[in-house]
Regions:
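Immediate flanking context of iron-sulfur cluster ligation sites
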Residues: 12-28, 60-83, 98-117
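Short coil/turn connectors at secondary-structure junctions
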Residues: 50-52, 76-78, 175-176
Length: 176
C-alpha cells in the first residue's frame, strides 16, 4: 500500500513548506521538482518517485538561484498570502535553471500550472524575469525605507517565500 500513498499527503504531514491546496492537481500550490521538472506532489504516488531526484522548497534553501529568486520576489512585492508561493517559486526555479533570462511568454507558461488568487501575476512575472539582474547582497529594504513612495520588503515576506509560513492546514494534533 505504501507505493500508492500520495506524495502530497506525505509532505503535508511531515514537512510544511510544500502547501497542499486542492489535492487534485488543479491549483499547483504543492508543486515540487522531480528531476528538475515541476510536478504537483498531490498527483504523485510514492511508487512513481523511485530513483527520481525530488526537490521541495525546503531542499533548495541553499541553492544560489533560489536565494536570488527569493530576493527578487521580495524586491518586486511578488509574495502575497503565501499559500501558492512555494509552488510558484519551484516552477520558476525549474525554468531559471534551464534559461537564466526567460522571455515573458516563457515565464507565463512556466507558471501557468500554479493558481494565485491574490495577485494579477505581473509582480511575480517581473520578479522571475529580473532575478538574474540583481545581486545576492543587494539590500533594498534599508535604502527604500528612506524614500517616500518606494516599496519596502514585507516583514513576513521571508516566511512566505521559503514556505515556513504556517497556515491552519499545516497544524496537526500532537502524536497524530
Amino acid at each position: 500500500e505504501v507505493p500508492s500513498r500520495g506524495l502530497g499527503d506525505v509532505y503535508k504531514r511531515q514537512i510544511k513548506g510544500t502547501k497542499v491546496g486542492c489535492n487534485a492537481g488543479d491549483c499547483g500550490s504543492c508543486t515540487i521538482l522531480m528531476d528538475n521538472n515541476p510536478f504537483c506532489s498531490c498527483l504523485l504516488t510514492l511508487g512513481k518517485i523511485k530513483n527520481k531526484k525530488i526537490e521541495t522548497i525546503e531542499g533548495v534553501s541553499e541553492d544560489k538561484q533560489f536565494i536570488l529568486l527569493k530576493k527578487s520576489f521580495s524586491i518586486h512585492g511578488a509574495a502575497q498570502c503565501g499559500i501558492c508561493t512555494p509552488g510558484i517559486i519551484m516552477s520558476a526555479l525549474a525554468l531559471l535553471r534551464k534559461n537564466k533570462f526567460p522571455k515573458k511568454e516563457e515565464v507565463e507558461f512556466a507558471l501557468s500550472g500554479v493558481l494565485c488568487r491574490c495577485t494579477g501575476y505581473q509582480k511575480i512575472i517581473n520578479a522571475v524575469m529580473n532575478v538574474n539582474k540583481i545581486t545576492e547582497n543587494k539590500n533594498t529594504s534599508s535604502n527604500n525605507m528612506k524614500e517616500v513612495g518606494k516599496r519596502i520588503e514585507r516583514i513576513d515576506g521571508e516566511k512566505k517565500l521559503d514556505g515556513t509560513e504556517i497556515f491552519g492546514d499545516d497544524f496537526s494534533p500532537e502524536n497524530s
